[in-house]
């Protein structure tokens, strides 16, 4: 008999951890950190102890107490069974910290599978010094729609569309039917056909675990398309007489490439922070121009209408030296991500002080409520588990589909019958 339990993503956005068990074997889907900027016990200068980070997280309840997952050499005697049991595998949906951020603490004997692009992106991030907490994870590639047999399970990876390359959903075949997991998914991005293909391939699943991020934000009918974001960025480039300031998420590489192309098309050069530039170059992007503290300010002052400067919060003081008459700040889902981030208010204060107008042009990586319902209608599972949401009860299943609202902390849901 197969069971499903949830160890993250319950009542919060992000940090999904779905554990499927059968006959002593386990498949874990995603293993990320909670996204809680400015919150928790470690903030305002209080940091975790070097070499004791895993222990600090375990003792403060930040990560789940799942036995036989974590590295024994990082536990420091914590009373939880460590090391691999030889019967556990981890499958990661994509390279966002709330889905992959704990992989550095996974015992090295546990196989960690992901898409080829996710592995490649993680390698590029490592070149830039952006690595998961802990130790470098050993990632194994799972081919597109190429089943992997693991104990009694048969796990198949499908590409889906999200705001990061390499995003995947999974179908886990158990003795009681298929458990399908969307990971993070959308239909308004550049590749909606990928998400729709996944939904079609897992039609009739015993259970569908689906993200519900946008359910948390009240009534929404639609999301802006990615191509609309490109067009709005080009509009800003053309209509702004002076310097364009922009923030965007560097792991959204397709948007990065599109912005670079639009900027070149109107004769502007994008100046990237050094860490981003290193990552882009490791990924394989060409003609990546880096902000150089010794030379870039003079270049920008001489011809502000020929440049776009990528701004991160720690870059804000440099704006004091730049020509900002006729400038605009374009927010395209970069840092700070939104009003929930303490740095958001600080950014607004800086822009107000500098008298730079703010323009938000981004779009999210998560399906709208209407699109979530569309995906559920396409799959028509027996059981629906809404996850990765503050308001999962807002996802109303169609007739004939039973909705179970996951409870955190290891409660098992049997796939053999109703709980």
Describe the role of every protein-language-model region.
Residues 2-89, 98-253, 258:
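His/Asp/Glu-rich metal-coordinating catalytic cores
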Residues 78-80, 232-233, 313-322, 366-377:
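A short, acidic, amphipathic alpha-helical segment used as a generic capping/interface helix at domain edges
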Residues 105-110, 178, 236-244, 264-266, ...:
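Short, surface-exposed connector motifs at secondary-structure boundaries
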Residues 110-120, 209, 269-277, 329-333, ...:
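Short internal beta-strands
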Residues 137-147, 289-296, 403-407:
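Short acidic-hydrophobic, aromatic-tinged amphipathic segments that line or gate anion-handling sites
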Residues 220-318, 323, 387:
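Hard-cation-handling environments
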Residues 315-355:
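Redox- and metal-dependent alpha/beta enzyme cores, enriched for Fe-S-associated oxidoreductases
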Residues 336, 341, 357-419:
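Internal alpha/beta domain cores that form substrate/cofactor-binding pockets in large enzymes
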